[in-house]
UniProtKB/Swiss-Prot annotation:
Species name: Escherichia albertii (strain TW07627)
GN (gene name): rspA
Name assigned to this protein: D-galactonate dehydratase family member RspA
Protein purpose: Has low D-mannonate dehydratase activity (in vitro), suggesting that this is not a physiological substrate and that it has no significant role in D-mannonate degradation in vivo. Has no detectable activity with a panel of 70 other acid sugars (in vitro).
Lineage: Bacteria, Pseudomonadati, Pseudomonadota, Gammaproteobacteria, Enterobacterales
Residues that hold substrate according to the record: 37, 122, 264, 285, 314, 318, 341
Reactions the enzyme catalyzes: D-mannonate = 2-dehydro-3-deoxy-D-gluconate + H2O
EC number in record: 4.2.1.-, 4.2.1.8
GO MF entries: magnesium ion binding; mannonate dehydratase activity
NCBIfam families from the UniProt entry: ManoateDhtManD, PRK15072.1
Amino-acid positions noted as binding Mg(2+) in the UniProt annotation, renumbered to this chain: 212, 238, 264
Enzyme class: lyase
Requisite cofactors: Mg(2+)
């Protein structure tokens, strides 16, 4: 089953998405997501200039061989651009293989391990009162796992905050220059336990409570934070410190039993090997779009299962609905599943990407349509051209550049 065409589309129906479409000689198509927030054109170029020409004439069934060819054959292995491109190819080929088999992808992977995929939502507020209102709204929607972020008194900007009340959170700023935000660790450490206390006092412990620290703390600060919030029984604290120094997580582990989730910026099993092997984390947050597609994520999840580490894949709406569809199939199958991030998509985005998944009372299901169960409206996508946008950068109050 030869590949005859491989096309790359960059569209911005509210956010920039990079979509790969592979077509076989039989007319069967597969979709893959290659979106890399703020660096979309780099991945699109890598695909268009290097991978797509080398896909033509290959057997679409040989997914593993193609994965290895693009990973080892590039010589310059790993990295977010290379791996996002490989991920899109892999995703599209699995879409094709499942369509040929006339079954949804999760069945091809080995069948469902659960009835539905528990997803967690994002709640925010510029004050504790606003955050509690947003929490209540998502609780009414049926979410069983809820991430909560909140504005911090004395800080003009805080990670996870929308530009205005009632608006969806959008971190990237359109234009040619990233927004600069200020950060104060001490103000954060002093305030955030008050938010969790307010949530638990008002809503109790029925929902799983999550929080994203977004790489902002040093290891000892993260240990202090984790210890200070143990009474609130967090589902996890996410990205407490930059993970390049993986040994530092041992220090955090020594001081707190608050579960740790890490990995949204990882793009291969080698990025998380030590963290998993030494059981320094509880959830691995690698995503299909950045960590090698279905093929790459299977390796990571299988390895993690040996050490009782569960998946908690990154999945905000700066990854396209194609990734979300693929992730739900993967999540329904993978034995050591934990939770799936789900921000939701605008109506405009979903018109470009007609989908087959469903949400019911805190759980999602990918549907039983053959393949990924998602489509791509090329004509509509063409009406939304690429718009430059960049993720923010953070500075301490004295002007020092910090981790965003």
């Amino acid at each position: 089953m030869k590949i005859v065409r491989a096309e790359v589309f960059v569209t911005c129906p509210g956010r920039n998405f990079v979509t790969l479409k592979i077509t076989t000689e039989d007319g069967i198509t597969g979709l893959g997501d290659a979106t890399l927030n703020g660096r979309e054109l780099s991945v699109a170029s890598y695909l268009q200039d290097h991978l797509c020409p080398q896909l033509i004439g290959r057997d679409a069934h040989r997914i593993e061989d193609i994965w290895q060819f693009f990973y080892k054959g590039a010589y310059w292995r790993r990295g977010p651009v290379t791996m996002s491109a490989i991920s899109a190819v892999d995703m599209a080929l699995w879409d094709i293989k499942a369509k040929v088999a006339n079954m949804p992808l999760y069945q091809l992977l080995g069948g469902a391990s659960r009835e539905g995929v528990m997803v967690y939502c994002h709640t925010t507020g510029h004050s504790i009162e606003e955050a509690l209102d947003d929490y209540a709204r998502h609780q009414e929607l049926g979410f069983k796992a809820i991430r909560v972020q909140c504005g911090i008194p004395g800080m003009k900007t805080t990670y996870g905050m929308s530009k205005g009340k009632g608006l969806a959170y959008e971190p990237a700023t359109k234009g040619q220059w990233p927004e600069e935000q200020l950060w104060s660790t001490e103000k954060y450490l002093d305030f955030m336990p008050k938010l969790f206390d307010a949530v638990r006092n008002k809503f109790g412990f029925d929902e799983h409570l999550l929080h994203d620290m977004h790489h902002r703390l040093t290891p000892i600060e993260a240990a202090r934070f984790g210890k200070s919030i143990e009474d609130y029984r967090m589902f996890w604290m996410e990205d407490p410190t930059p993970a390049e120094n993986q040994e530092c997580f041992r220090l955090i582990r020594q001081h707190t039993v608050t579960p740790i989730a890490v990995g949204e910026v990882f793009n291969s099993i080698w990025d998380c090997k030590q963290l998993i092997e030494e059981q320094l984390i509880d959830y691995i947050r690698t995503t299909l779009t950045h960590a090698g597609g279905i093929t790459g994520m299977r390796r990571i999840a299988d390895f993690a299962s040996l050490y009782q580490v569960r998946t908690g894949s990154h999945g905000p709406s700066d990854l396209s609905p194609v990734c979300m569809a693929a992730a739900l199939h993967f999540d329904l199958w993978v034995p050591n599943f934990g939770v799936q991030e789900y921000m939701g998509y605008s109506e405009q985005m979903l018109e470009v990407f007609p989908h087959n998944w469903t949400f019911d009372n805190g759980y999602m299901h990918p549907g039983d349509k053959p393949g990924l169960g998602i489509e791509f409206d090329e004509k509509l996508a063409a009406k939304y051209p690429y718009e430059p946008a960049y993720l923010p950068v953070a500075r301490l109050e004295d002007g020092t550049l910090w981790n965003w």
